[in-house]
């Protein structure tokens, strides 16, 4: 982890943004190396947002493994700093519906929304985010024709997704699960799919994919790395 490596990683992603590619596949990058090089980005998604977004586009993180798909409403942010608003939730999920229509040819995708708090807040006893933010967002989205559930307890919501994944079902209950923060969505999909999980950046004019895992410096030079993640990332844009 050095400033030189961070600078090389940054310039590589920036160059990919500049050449007019229809899709970009990136390898994992060490965020601390970006910081050492003076580039204060929390990840490659944020770099893509800076150099490719226009007309108020939002780059979002969609994770997929075959029929199991998860959208994150927030990206690389500390739990104490999560700041969801009704307007932001509505915008991100409308973008997601547009992406499903354009790229997956699903006109009316079914979305399952995770509750923010344990047991989806228990009617406000365990937290007010569902009442103050998520339920009003769902009401607005339904007015716009979005097929979305109310906030559901996240600890049980993903059980069905895991079963469908292992049974390799092509017909699923929900086309995408919507998580409020990073670990809420990534723990379930990575637990069942492992290295087959792909990170897909949506919301921009191009699609970017990368393996769902990190740099794995702990196994560097040991000849035990598994290329599955990179292969799946490449296949996802073809």
Predicted regions and their residues:
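Anion-binding alpha/beta catalytic cores of soluble intermediary-metabolism enzymes, centered on
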Residues: 1-238
């Amino acid at each position: 982890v050095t400033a030189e490596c961070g600078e090389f990683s940054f310039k590589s992603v920036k160059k990919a943004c500049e050449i007019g590619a229809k899709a970009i596949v990136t390898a994992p990058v060490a965020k601390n190396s970006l910081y050492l090089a003076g580039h204060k980005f929390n990840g490659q998604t944020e770099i893509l947002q800076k150099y490719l977004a226009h007309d108020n586009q939002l780059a979002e993180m969609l994770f997929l493994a075959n029929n199991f798909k998860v959208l994150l409403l927030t990206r690389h942010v500390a739990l104490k700093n999560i700041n969801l608003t009704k307007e932001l939730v509505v915008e991100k999920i409308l973008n997601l519906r547009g992406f499903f229509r354009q790229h997956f040819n699903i006109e009316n995708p079914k979305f399952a929304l995770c509750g923010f708090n344990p047991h989806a807040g228990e009617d406000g006893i365990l937290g007010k985010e569902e009442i103050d933010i998520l339920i009003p967002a769902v009401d607005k989205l339904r007015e716009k024709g979005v097929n979305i559930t109310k906030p559901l307890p996240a600890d049980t919501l993903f059980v069905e997704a895991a079963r469908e994944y292992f049974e390799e079902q092509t017909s699923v209950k929900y086309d995408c699960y919507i998580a409020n923060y990073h670990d809420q969505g990534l723990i379930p999909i990575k637990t069942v799919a492992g290295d087959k999980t792909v990170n897909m950046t949506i919301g921009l004019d191009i699609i970017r994919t990368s393996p769902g895992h990190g740099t794995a410096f702990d196994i560097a030079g040991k000849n035990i790395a598994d290329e599955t993640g990179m292969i799946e990332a490449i296949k996802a844009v073809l």
